[in-house]
Amino acid sequence: MAPSLRVAVTQAEPEWLDLAGTVKKTCELITEAANNGARLIAFPECWVTGYPGWIWARPVDFELNTKYIYNSLSIGSPEFEQIASTAKRHSIAVVLGFSERTSTHSLYISQAIISPQGATLLHRRKIKPTHVERAVFGDGSGADLSNVVDVDFGGDVGVVKVGALACWEHTQPLLKYHTYSQGEVIHVAAWPPIDPHPGVEHPGLWSMSAEGCQNLSQTYAVEGGGYVLHCTGVCTEKGMETMGTHKGLLFHTPGGGHSCVIGPDGRRLTQPLHGGDPAKEGIVYADLDLTNVVANRSFLDNVGHYSRPDLLWLGVDRKQKQHVIPRDEEEPSRKANVVVPKQE
């Protein structure tokens, strides 16, 4: 029998601007998914503690921004360890999207992959926040390019390569190609709540709509030849009221939920939850036949037989850039460029 892995893709609304409440809900969803046989669960972009939708209405809001910082999640914090402990207790891998808070109160759009054993296998930051997201979040660095890890599911499944990107990172050809090159089998495409496009005459970008974003995830599946867990959040009247987004470009109507599972050839494998009501919460489940990845790549492997690295290749700098480098720890290349004045 072919190895099969049950996955769970959340379509849920966070407890907006409430770290403790969202962590509690996260653990409840992890438990629910595990009780239904899932061995991996995916969460959307900035699930903890909600995507800051007000930035698309008013980029400067000191009160909300400050509250958002205080309610963002720090790596190694008790709240993070609570999520990891829940994953370990239920032997389920967790791919978590969150607003990361550093010790200096900077924020990053981050993702973590937690193993069924409770270990943090991956912590990465979005390479470049999109448009007005830059009013809140900083950039990732070289280490964040390594975004695929080996997850040991044990039993008949064993080790599977799982990776993640956030939102419009799925528009970046070089970043996608680098991710493919790491041998990814299951990819989590994390998105915020996203709404259908209003129509051809509307000035809003189709590529930011529910249809456009799913198209990007399906394209990713085709190019990468692996399964894609397309994970979106939900925003109801509660979120709109909390963030004051009724008159904003985005988050002005209840909805946003369009989670699904996409096969290695790009086809959608699951039906919309609740008859397609994007304001309803739930979990999408799918049983993945991992041999389909092998079969698909016998036709198309963009980082293998279906490529020409002798003609086209990608250069990568994976070094993490530090803000402060002591002089005695400078790289040789930096030292070589230092000009020491002659002593008279």
Curated annotation (Swiss-Prot):
Keywords: Aminoacyl-tRNA synthetase, Hydrolase, Ligase. InterPro entries: C-N_Hydrolase, C-N_Hydrolase_sf, Nitrilase/CN_hydratase_CS, Nitrilases_CHs. One of its GO terms (molecular function) is aminoacyl-tRNA ligase activity. CDD domains: nitrilases_CHs. The keyword Aminoacyl-tRNA synthetase applies. Residues 324-344 are annotated as: Disordered. It catalyses: a nitrile + 2 H2O = a carboxylate + NH4(+); 4-chlorophenylacetonitrile + 2 H2O = 4-chlorophenylacetate + NH4(+). It comes from the Eukaryota. The active site is at E45, K126, C167. Residues 5-290 form the CN hydrolase domain. Its EC number is 3.5.5.1, 3.5.5.5. Pfam families: CN_hydrolase (PF00795). Belongs to the carbon-nitrogen hydrolase superfamily. Nitrilase family. PANTHER family: ARYLACETONITRILASE (PTHR46044:SF14), NITRILASE (PTHR46044). Nitrilase that hydrolyzes preferentially phenylacetonitrile and (R,S)-mandelonitrile. Also acts on dinitriles like phenylenediacetonitriles (PDAs) 1,2-PDA, 1,3-PDA, and 1,4-PDA, and cyanophenyl acetonitriles (CPAs) 2-CPA and 4-CPA. This is Arylacetonitrilase. It comes from Macrophomina phaseolina (strain MS6).
